[in-house]
Structure formats: C-alpha cells, structure tokens
Amino acid sequence: MKIIIQRVKKAQVSIEGQIQGKINQGLLLLVGVGPEDQEEDLDYAVRKLVNMRIFSDVEGKMNLSVKDIEGEILSISQFTLFADTKKGNRPAFTGAAKPDMASDFYDAFNQKLAQEVPVQTGIFGADMQVELVNNGPVTIILDTKKR
C-alpha cells in the first residue's frame, strides 16, 4: 500500500456535485493498493495511521495522534500512486492492483480503520473532487513495503 497522509483542518469529497464524505480536523488519506498487498500491510497501515503523532500538543510539538485529538479520517482511493513515469510522457498504472482486488482491499482497510476512529470515504473508482485545508502543511508518504 502507498498512502499519502495529509493533516487537515477540514476536507470533503464530492461526486457529481454531491458531497460524499466530509470531515473536520483529522487526516486526509490518498490510498493506493498494490498487487502484492496482504493483510499484514493493511494491519500495519491502520496501526501506523491511528497512532502517528503528527498533531501539535499544547507546547506546539507534534506529539498527538488522530486518536488523541479525537479527529476524523477521510479516505480516498488513489490508484495513480502506483504510476510508472519512466518511459514516455503518459504514466502507466500497471503497478496498481487490479480493480476487483483493490476495491475489496480498500473496503477492508476502511472498515478496520473505522474500528479506531471515525472514517468517511469516497467511492472506489469514481471521478471525485477533493477539497481540503491542509494544516501545517504536514504531508507524509507511507509505503507498507518500506518498513
């Protein structure tokens, strides 16, 4: 899995002009699923995400997790994180998991995440418009194959 993590003051996702998911303070996740991803990748990602200390404490130190601040998560599927740009000018996406596998894996990821913190989602495979107010900015890349 490859996940772009953005600390946000608020974020929302819309599909065809209708708001699908909306959060206040928390994390916006852009989630890519790879063909080799397993249950252990899912567990690792969830554990890291809910415990990652990237929110400021009273002293202004990044010392609190999304769980600590009782924040929310907006999770968006993003197969383009597996783009291969080595050849030519058009990215290839053959490094991403096939849609059926990726959709099931993404759903399982969100269900497990929702056991820890409130989660809103987009719709897998939909054309989505994502709006956010990045807080910091703080943007982190989590790759479950690099641990």
UniProtKB/Swiss-Prot annotation:
Pfam family, one: Tyr_Deacylase
Purpose of the protein: An aminoacyl-tRNA editing enzyme that deacylates mischarged D-aminoacyl-tRNAs. Also deacylates mischarged glycyl-tRNA(Ala), protecting cells against glycine mischarging by AlaRS. Acts via tRNA-based rather than protein-based catalysis; rejects L-amino acids rather than detecting D-amino acids in the active site. By recycling D-aminoacyl-tRNA to D-amino acids and free tRNA molecules, this enzyme counteracts the toxicity associated with the formation of D-aminoacyl-tRNA entities in vivo and helps enforce protein L-homochirality.
GO cellular component, one term: cytoplasm
GO MF annotation terms: D-tyrosyl-tRNA(Tyr) deacylase activity; Gly-tRNA(Ala) deacylase activity; Ser(Gly)-tRNA(Ala) hydrolase activity; tRNA binding
Family, similarity comment: Belongs to the DTD family.
Subunit structure: Homodimer.
Catalytic function, reaction form: glycyl-tRNA(Ala) + H2O = tRNA(Ala) + glycine + H(+); a D-aminoacyl-tRNA + H2O = a tRNA + a D-alpha-amino acid + H(+)
Keyword field: Cytoplasm, Hydrolase, RNA-binding, tRNA-binding
This protein's domain notes: A Gly-cisPro motif from one monomer fits into the active site of the other monomer to allow specific chiral rejection of L-amino acids.
Phylogenetic placement of the source organism: Bacteria, Bacillati, Bacillota, Bacilli, Lactobacillales
Single biological process term from Gene Ontology: D-amino acid catabolic process
Name assigned to this protein: D-aminoacyl-tRNA deacylase
Documented EC number(s): 3.1.1.96
Cross-referenced Gene3D superfamilies: D-tyrosyl-tRNA(Tyr) deacylase
Domain of life (superkingdom): Bacteria
Motif (Gly-cisPro motif, important for rejection of L-amino acids): 136-137
Subcellular localization(s) per the UniProt record: Cytoplasm
